[in-house]
A protein has these predicted regions:
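Solvent-exposed strand-to-loop "edge" motifs in beta-rich extracellular domains
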Residues: 90-96, 119, 175
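Short carbohydrate-recognition loop motifs
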Residues: 51-72
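Extracellular carbohydrate-recognition regions
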Residues: 21-44
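Bacterial N-terminal signal peptides
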Residues: 7-16
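Extracellular beta-strand elements of beta-rich domains used
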Residues: 29, 192, 210-214
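Extracellular/luminal beta-rich ligand-recognition
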Residues: 107-152
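Extracellular beta-strand ligand-recognition surfaces/modules
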Residues: 109-114, 150-151, 156-160, 164-204
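Extracellular/lumenal carbohydrate-interaction signature centered on repeated Trp-anchored short motifs
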Residues: 76-87, 161-164, 185
Length: 217
């Protein structure tokens, strides 16, 4: 009888406790994966950003080098933001874009960007995005609409003012950010993109991306 009651209590407790969501890795950063990612060259850019795979003691990484270039790597992936709303990014800027005004069209380049995308219409132009950036000139926490479209918000998660040529890990609550910046209650995102771009400034940037994933906390 005692054993039966214990079993009932255990089952009841299991039903009450929330289910722990496992982290969701977005990129593997392997040569094989690199071949499958969607490459999108920015319209008007003279060159494509060069992306190669490397590794260190913490695993694989993506190295991006842009010389008067702009192209991104995209991946369609569904992420349930009710379970795993937090994006985690580890990145490093080796060569930044010192002196540019990132909130203007002429200076709208970033050594590091990770776009989180939500489809909100029939065409890509209707999509809304939060653009998490590694800034060369602005402080962490600064944000503004892209000078090209209000449907994309630039949000500074890291800056070379504080971290130049060193690895840094940051996180952000994507669900809260879509509500804050777009007034959207988003339960699921549709894609992630990475880009290092210098097509507006005509400069050179070198950045490394590693271990991008979503988690519950």
């Amino acid at each position: 009888m005692i054993k039966y009651l214990f079993k009932i209590c255990f089952i009841s407790l299991a039903l009450i406790l929330p289910v722990k969501a496992e982290p969701i890795q977005v990129f593997e950063f392997t040569d094989q994966e690199l071949k499958t990612l969607k490459v999108r060259k920015v319209r008007g850019a003279d060159n494509k950003t060069n992306y190669i795979i490397g590794s260190n003691e913490n695993g694989n990484y993506l190295k991006a080098e842009a010389n008067n270039a702009a192209s991104g790597l995209g991946k369609e992936i569904k992420i349930n933001l009710n379970l795993t709303p937090i994006i985690n990014i580890t990145w490093k800027v080796e060569k930044n874009l010192d002196g540019i005004k990132e909130d203007t069209k002429k200076g709208h380049d970033f050594a590091g960007r990770v776009f989180v995308i939500k489809k909100t219409g029939a065409t890509p132009l209707s999509n809304k995005a939060v653009n998490y950036v590694f800034s060369s000139n602005n402080k962490v926490g600064n944000n503004w609409p892209s000078p090209y479209t209000k449907k994309s918000i630039d949000n500074v998660l890291s800056t070379t003012i504080e971290h130049m040529n060193e690895w840094v890990t940051v996180k952000a609550n994507v669900k809260k950010d879509f509500k804050k910046f777009h007034d959207l209650d988003v339960n699921e995102i549709d894609g992630i993109a990475i880009m290092t771009d210098t097509d507006n400034s005509k400069m050179t940037a070198i950045t490394y991306y590693q271990n991008i994933y979503f988690s519950a906390q």
